[in-house]
Amino acid sequence: MLLQSLFAWALAIGPCIAQNSTNSTWPIHNNGLTTQVEWDHYSLMVDGQRFFLWSGEFHYWRIPVPELWVDVLQKVKAAGFNTFAIYTHWYFHNPNPNTLDFENAAHNFTKIFDLAKELGMFVVFRPGPYVNAESNAGAFPLWLTTGAYGALRNNDERYTEAWTPFWEKVASIVAPYQFTNGGNVLTYQIENELGSQWRGTPSNKVPNLSSVEYMEALEASARAHGITIPFQANDPNLNSDSWSKDFYDGYGSVDIYGMDSYPACWTCNLTECDSTNGAYKAFNVIDYYDHFEAISPTQPSFLPEFQGGSFNPWGGPEGGCPENSPADFANLFYRNNVGQRVTAMSLYMIYGGTNWGWLAAPVVATSYDYSSPISENRMINDKYAETKLFGHFLRVAKDLTKTDRIGTGKTASTNPNVVYSEIRNPDTNAAFYVTIHKESTVGTREEFYINANTSKGAFKIPQKAASIVLNGFQSKIIVTDFNFGSHSLLYSTAEVLSHSIVDDQDILALWMPTGEAGEFVVTGAKSGSVSSCGGCSSVGFYPQGDDLLVTISQSKGISVLTFDDGLRVLVMDRSFAYEFWVPVLTADPFSPANETVFVQGPSLVRSAAYSSDGSTLDLTGDNNGTSTQIQVFPPKSVSKVTWNGQVITTEKTDYDSLIGSLTGPALDSLTLPTISGWKANDSLPERLPTYDDSWWVAADHMNTSNPTKPETLPVLYIDDYGYHVGNHLWRGRFEGSASGVYLSVTGGRAFGYSAWLNGEFIGSYLGAAYPDTGKLTLSFSNVTVNSNSTNILLVLQDNSGHDETSEALNPRGINNATLISSSTKNFTSWKVTGTAGKPDTAIDPVRGILSEGGLYAERLGWHLPDFDDSEWSSASPSNVSSSAGVTFYRTTVSLAIPTGLDVAISFTLKASPSNAALRVLLFVNGYQYGRFSPWIGNQVEFPVPPGILNYDGDNVIGLSVWRQEEGDESMGVNVGWKVTEAFASSFEPIFDAAYLQPGWTDERLQYA
């Protein structure tokens, strides 16, 4: 559509935007390649069926065990999501310009598409090539960060040549799994938060051709390699107005526009978000409605990334900041988005995972828990449960997919402190009143009524029950003319949870906060009764013409109401709703109500299926505690229920449910063996002048492509020499005397470095949470300087990763190395080493290029299974050497977790003293799964999943301890582990993970 005609059309219909719209008002779009996925002002449409895209993000490369992906995705599905989103990771798959790896272990992500099909979920595929994601250089391959490929994320031919092989291969891999080819991949994102379509003010529409041509090239390449599904984009904020065809049809604009938002800040350091969100106020909602109406009025309002939590930066609070986006955040903000007509939303993150190895950007440490609904250890939490209530509602609220906003900011009757937005389906007249505090940052208890318009007139509701309550940072969606199956609610002040059809009869589930009252009207019902009162009170049935008004108060428990036409209504409080599940019996992402079953009680229900004769309901899932009641609502033909393959004893109730009990493990019954039997060896022989570095790379470049030039020569930027991650070692030589050295070293936030002259320690930069450069003048006064021969300076530096976005080219290495001397300021030569393998190759293709750094222990494979440490001495990391240096500790511990249990295990690292100047790396069966810097803080627990840990077998545990200070003060690290959660589960965490844990080979010896 031409820009001029679009805006003329928009102006013509402008007054309709906040009013009911007829079916013909808004055009239906597709991309011209398929009509299977279409969209309009209201929602996406899949094969003609309107669809609320409810998604959560997870990153397969942050949980590098393919056997665990099904566990995570089953939990996503169980929470009511119909979609999940994934990023790829360019560097993970493209370790050097000549290698693409989509085959080894977790590098092969096609299993995820098979799981999506099996579970009945759509996929939003986000291949980058740049993804940000708090990943090292935003997932750029680090060989790209030298400056030789230009400024990146533009139309530079050098950059284009770099991304083309990866981009083409990804498209060809994904193409067979598209919805248009019988798969479940629904949309394909181009780039990520590239808000640079325009030069200057977006309203002037002056194209930024560098970005425009880049986007156009990415789009054309994806199409040429088989991608036919719609393209989407995610604008980074409310200000850049980039890539919407409604705003401008051309200049690289994509099919479906989206905009990302993190109203409670994407990091625990809240001040970082001030420039985007303004000064932080807890629970301060943001208006998106006007933005989408202006920028993408003929498209669904889409939030490709909406806040699911926050990452924890170096030095952040121990355990992250879940209090910034708790369960109440999910309740309030997700409902408020519905009130703004959002019909496509993906939570970032639904499961965060771990920055194992050197995946992380400098802004974040090892944990990428993100305070997500599914925790880093794969266990679900209260935010998950609250999110599930919302997800189950979305699944059955079909009329939400087409609504107009009738009004917003309306004051509730009798209480000016409560306001609501009214959205209404123009076809069915179903309405949704989304209520919040007038000041969303205020969590006071407020009682109120609303004036609701229904198909049978206007009512001040509730009519008979106690008033509606907002208690705390909460929102409620009050429905009117809510259709489910063959029934309808004229209204309900209790929130709708779910709907199922069993034996051709409707079952409706409602919920309310514990102790509150609700009122609903069942149209066409004549009478009702209480079949089971589990915490109910003040139940009343009041005929109103052809309808029946019902009042009920609900304490902890679940109550069952039965009506004259066979309708059953379950009413439960929040605590019982948290343990209420609606497994789907089909792989249809639309989850039809007649293909679901209600289950209440277990910690998790993963799947449900009926036997071929319909007499048995087979359930799988998780449960804990010594005894858990389970209640199911299956067809009358079901007389037997199995749980994880075992028949459970049940009793049939008068209202046709089956009740039984489950048994599970007591957490205190699981004990882990003590981690002991440590052996140790020196991991820094490079400090010694006798060390042979003849095989190291000569650091002799006198120029660099990097736009940031060094202060001294030669160039000592690590990426220029083919090393990129972890610890790097520089050896500089000089002749004659000097009294000291000035060093300026850059390694990213929280990095550090230490230096030795001729084998003697001269000092360290200990690092801090935010500075990325450390400048020191180190004296040689206490060490021996060879005035008549060669002196060797060793600099061991940490590299916490490359910066993101436009700062990915920021160099890592030594910016300035100047001798303090009357005769010479310069070193005669430099050499460097890092990760084992030739520069820009991966010696360990299974674990991948980001797995390990350049410490002596890593290069020689001391962290790997099968390494022979028989000649090492016994020593404990709890008391490290008094000398500054690096010591590697290693032990083997066997686990024997009982089968039938899913167990979360975390390592605990405790420094002595608590702020010891130590840099510690934790290795488990060859994987680096913890970076512990007690001087900076604050992560002390490190979850390690099965597949990395062998739950039934031996585990090689390694610990690299870099002491940055010398002296008599005792320093050490106490290493422990613990079971944090345990469930009886259908998911089996014991499997053969040998292919994920390749062992030591003598190839490593050449890197000594």
Swiss-Prot record:
Principal location class: secreted
UniProt-annotated binding residues for substrate: Y87, N132, A133, E134, N192, Y262, Y370
GO cellular component: extracellular region; vacuole
Gene Ontology process terms (BP): galactose catabolic process; polysaccharide catabolic process
SMART domains given in the database record: BetaGal_dom2
Disulphide-bridged cysteine pairs: C268-C321
Keywords carried by this UniProt record: Carbohydrate metabolism, Disulfide bond, Glycoprotein, Glycosidase, Hydrolase, Polysaccharide degradation, Secreted, Signal
Documented EC number(s): 3.2.1.23
Job of this protein: Cleaves beta-linked terminal galactosyl residues from gangliosides, glycoproteins, and glycosaminoglycans.
The family this protein is said to belong to: Belongs to the glycosyl hydrolase 35 family.
Protein name (database record): Probable beta-galactosidase B
Organism for this UniProt entry: Sclerotinia sclerotiorum (strain ATCC 18683 / 1980 / Ss-1) (White mold)
